[in-house]
C-alpha cells in the first residue's frame, strides 16, 4: 500500500479531512516509497536515494504524514525516532567511542547496519 492509499482510506473512514498540501506531500512520499522498495530489491550496487525534509507550520499534519509514510514503507530496516532522542543516543555512542579513530564514522556505520531508512520527528 502506498502512502496516498492509506491517506485515502483514512479520509474515507472519516479519520482525516482532505488537505491539498498534505496530498501534494504524500505524492512525493509515494515516489520516495517506490524508489526505496525498488532499491531494496535490486541485485546491483545500491545507490543513495535523496530523502525529503518536511517543514511547515505547527498543526499542518507533518508528523501524521511521516507516520503514514513510515507505516506503509515495506522495509524491515526502518527506524522512526525523535531528533533529540537520536542526538542523545549518538552523543552517548560518541562518548563510548572516545579515543578511537573517526568515532563519528564508527557510530554512523553502527546505525546503518540496522537502518536503511531513518525518519526523524
Regions found by a protein language model. Give the residues of each.
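N-terminal pre-Walker A segment at the start of P-loop NTPase domains
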Residues: 15-43
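Pre-Walker A (Motif I) flank of P-loop NTPase domains
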Residues: 45-54, 116
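Walker A (P-loop) phosphate-binding loop of P-loop NTPases
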Residues: 59
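Conserved lysine of the Walker
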Residues: 62
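Hydrophobic positions on the alpha1 helix immediately C-terminal to the Walker A/P-loop
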Residues: 65, 69, 82
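Post-Walker A helix-loop "phosphate-sensing" segment adjacent to the P-loop in P-loop NTPases
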Residues: 70-79
